[in-house]
Amino acid sequence: MAYINEINVTKQGDSIIFLDLNQSPAERAQSDHIRTLGIMGLHQSAERMGLPSTTMHWASYWDQEDVIKYIDKWLKTVGSTRPIFGFSNLFGLDIFGSTTEQPSNITLANKIKENFPDSKLIVGGPNPVCVTKPLVKLDALFYGRALWLMERWLQDKPIPKKNEDVNEFGIPIFFNDVAVIPEDPIVPDLHADYCLNEQDIVTFETRLGCKFNCTFCGYEFRGNKDPYNANEDHVLAFFEEAHSHGITRFSIVDDTFNEEKSKFDLMLNVTRQLDFQPRIVGFNRFDVLAHKPDQIGMLDEMGFHGHLWGIETFHPQASKAIRKTARTDKFFKVLEHIRDDYPHWWVTGSIIVGIPPETTDYSYEMAKRYIGEGLFSGVNLHALMVRKFAEGISESDADFAKDPMKYGITLTGKEHKDDMYADWTTATSSYREAEICKDRILKLGLRNGIGPVNPWNALSKDAIGHELFTTAGKERMAAGVKANHHIDNAKTYFTESWISDWELLIRNYVNRKMEYVETL
């Protein structure tokens, strides 16, 4: 553990506490408990600089008095009087503004500032845009993958003008160039500070960036033409260290794992040296898998058994519009093969309704087939979303958002000014029609025992004994979904089925953290 030494050379602070925040209200329990890679990477950076640092996973769900108690004890232990609080949030817009879904985050941040007035508050994440004026005094915002920018900020080093600005509320913001990879993939060391146990799921990257450039995607490192992989020895050491904590479940957070064979080679070389069988989940492109079926066996061998497949559409022309290649009959044959021969896989199909020129009738007909034939374990459904508050500054907006008319999308301007997504129409659909169709497909899925359960949800349930990577386990869940298909709010059943597990996980983790801080 690093204690105060030479770090007082920085004007920013003399320690840093990273808090993992979530947008979901406490009464709508989290459906997974994956350890967030962001704050592990940030913590690793701070440790490397000699800056005392600690992490607080799932801080939104701690009792707030416990948050203050832990911070106070830790700061006194390391002798810090000018702490920096780094709030990390995945996919959350306006987390401290009036449109937030989790107002208790505002209460928490203000309570921290009240108790530690000589502190600074910074926010990072894939898209930490302030849609409305923050109700918390913030000192900086770090957009996207910004470890290197935070490091320079912490050390008072110059930041390139093209990577900084000030937003409309006067808060300094820092962001990356598009498709320029500024740092290595994160393969974290597993510090005692994380208080891990055998129910945890830890994350890592084999590569930062994605070589594809889908028109609906706003990922800042898409279209990457100069990729490089994580160090194989580091990945092996990570798996072995995790297993020393009893951990056998992992999440690869690459944007698209199966984009290139070298990543398969890396993971096969690593997993063949392990003395345990890992269970891995992550993102893969289904069209690539369908055209390279040899990937299926390699994924199975390495333990990559949980998949979120960005299929998006089965419509050949619509798939061309997003720079993918749908071959309807071929897709269904591959899905049938995986259903029949890989029952120990959890596969979630991610579908976007409304991509032109696909009609909602076509979307629903396809859904009747993939749901009726049980080709997915879960479904991830969205109407086509055109973000209003994407990063913009770094030109990382999706092509659909940059130039919608080019793709036959007309923005109507009829949405509320604070809505996250623009209202739209096309020659074949509209945002409203796509939303209605999406809800119809979701209800169809529920009636057939297929819910909005992604592989991270499934792996989390598996980690606490529900065995969702078995035929019997999936059948039990399907029976529960069918029995509750009448519930109007599709998330209610899943909240009820997860909440007791989630509350127990958080309580046990907080207890471990409180015991840990007493040992320092």
Which stretches of residues belong to each language-model region?
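Non-catalytic positions within long, well-ordered alpha-helices that form the structural scaffold/packing
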Residues: 134, 243, 300, 371-372
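Acidic, low-complexity intrinsically disordered segments
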Residues: 2-241
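A general structural detector for well-ordered alpha-helical segments in enzyme core domains, enriched
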Residues: 42, 70, 74, 101-112, ...
